[in-house]
């Protein structure tokens, strides 16, 4: 089974070019075609993977294994098709290329342009004599026609067709690229004989020509760039430049003898500098003519299509050169000491370096000090939390004793008892935030006095605050308001038939937040919720369900606390009936 479909080959090639560009000095387009040819092998996936490892190692070196593994992952997930919607279709590309056929067909074969160039201004009614093949001013970039022509110096590789020669990369865009300079004058430049808005610019550079040149070619009015097959860094125009930079030299040819034997045919080599790390070198010839012959030669270097050659510009520096090169001069001036200077530092020598050991000891000491500070902070935080818990527990006990004492000695101190009750509730909430168990704390004596004041206010007790200390347990920050909600959280559902029971359970599962469902009878259900919010959500939404509109809902109060109290000295008689919350059907309390 093929690793990819042929209709997806264009997208895969685009992905491979983008992946190869930063990790290889070879031409990304040609190398991607080579990689796709390897992936097309009719073998198992593991065999193709091993083939890619062996064939791409010469070009990618240490990046070979990560690159191949990544490509197979991409092929398995087909992630290279993610950008397919943004790419033009093949038909559109073919159509655009056919529009921009060779430049020679764009130049008129007759003297149809003589009238326009012999007159200072075009006559009224004259049409544009430029051929229809000239691209639109805002059209796509135009490649030089020779960019896709097969090389006449090397035969095409079997199985690859007429692929571009890597030693002869695509020729740059023509100077009249519509994206850079419009071949036609833009409209509305100046007023002509026919008035404003006419598509003529009478001071165009294309009209500045010699009247005697009847065969004036407007496309040659601009200087042509260097269209050679080698890479240039603008140093080839310098007649004093005699240095070349060669990259991506294979290991078997990376020595002074082979390099000199190949490049000596172009002229006398004065100096060869090798860069073992990047397999590149700098060549210095005795004359600019010899260097130019080597640079412009169409012959592949060492018969390898992926070796690149540049003009070396000393002013910009050689970004791949290390600080110390293996400098190999001519045999008359060679020095073996320069060879030793290019050797990399042995990692084993670092173990014998005292400064290296001192640096390791310093880093280790800093790390140990950092761990000590972290442990000390943790211990201090635990001690602080323990003190907070002990203080809160002590305050609770003192508050209970004080409330009990006031209750026994002063029967008429209702206001003071209400204040202590509120403070006691705040202390219980604070203890709950600190993680202290408050279940064993006796109920507040507020229920025994026959009155219910959940929101009683007053001055805070000494040593307490209106906010809660500590981080809490995810209930907001330390300044968040707290309240005790004693409203009912249990609902009684009446008129539940077997048909409505399933719909009721489905809606209950949708709302969630319930704790228990009991069935006192076949037509009645008691539902306990975790909080008042969930209960109200169920209460308000059950009427909107079509099958549950006939149900009757009622709030079930919490267990009433009945406490018999004696009459106060004020003559007030408070009974436990004041604590009961009456339940009315369908009414929120």
UniProtKB/Swiss-Prot annotation:
- Spell out which residues are annotated as carrying Phosphothreonine: 332
Classification via CDD domains: RRM1_RBM26_like (cd12257), RRM_AtRDRP1_like (cd21612)
Q: Does the keyword Signal apply?
A: no
Kindly list the GO molecular function terms attached to this UniProt entry: RNA binding
Q: Which residues carry this modification: Phosphoserine?
A: 330, 334
What Gene Ontology cellular component terms go with this record? chromatin; Mei2 nuclear dot complex; MTREC complex; nuclear body; nucleus
Q: Does the keyword Cell inner membrane apply?
A: no
The record's InterPro entries line, in alphabetical order, gives:
Nucleotide-bd_a/b_plait_sf, PWI_dom, RBD_domain_sf, RBM26/27, RRM_dom
Bias (Low complexity) ranges: 330-340
Superkingdom, natural source: Eukaryota
Task: Quote the protein name from its UniProt record.
Answer: Uncharacterized RNA-binding protein C902.04
